[in-house]
Amino acid sequence: MAHPKFITCGQSDELSRAVTQLQQLSWQSVQSQADILLLPVPSFNDSGSVKGGGDLPSALNALKEDAWIVGGNLQHPTLAGRKILDFLKDPVYVAKNAQITAHCAIRLAMEKLPCTLSGLPCLVIGW
């Protein structure tokens, strides 16, 4: 079996050591030892599948029983009885995420518009 590949952001000795260690293991051994399953935020599309793909029941079966499931909008029947942390129920997370979304929307508008935003009526709304 091929070794897993990891993409990381940031640089630190700890991160380098962790990536080296993880690259030497199989996915099964990493998954069976994991304390946390981090899902996308929001975690599921309208059909109930994990956004971005993946087989949730198989992933859950391979995890330790007491592993945390972390993501957003985690009201999914497969997660019943699991320890979950739903970022989208945290008002601080939601506010910070809205701030970042608004910042990016304004930046994109500034790049695409043929004029400045100064004096223009502008409303930034989220999801």
Language-model regions, residue ranges each:
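Short acidic low-complexity segments
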Residues: 26-35
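Short aromatic/hydrophobic-glycine micro-motifs
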Residues: 24-27, 82
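Glycine-rich adenosine-cofactor-binding loop
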Residues: 6-22, 116-127
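Glycine/serine-rich phosphate-binding loop and adjoining beta1-alpha1 elements at the start
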Residues: 39-118
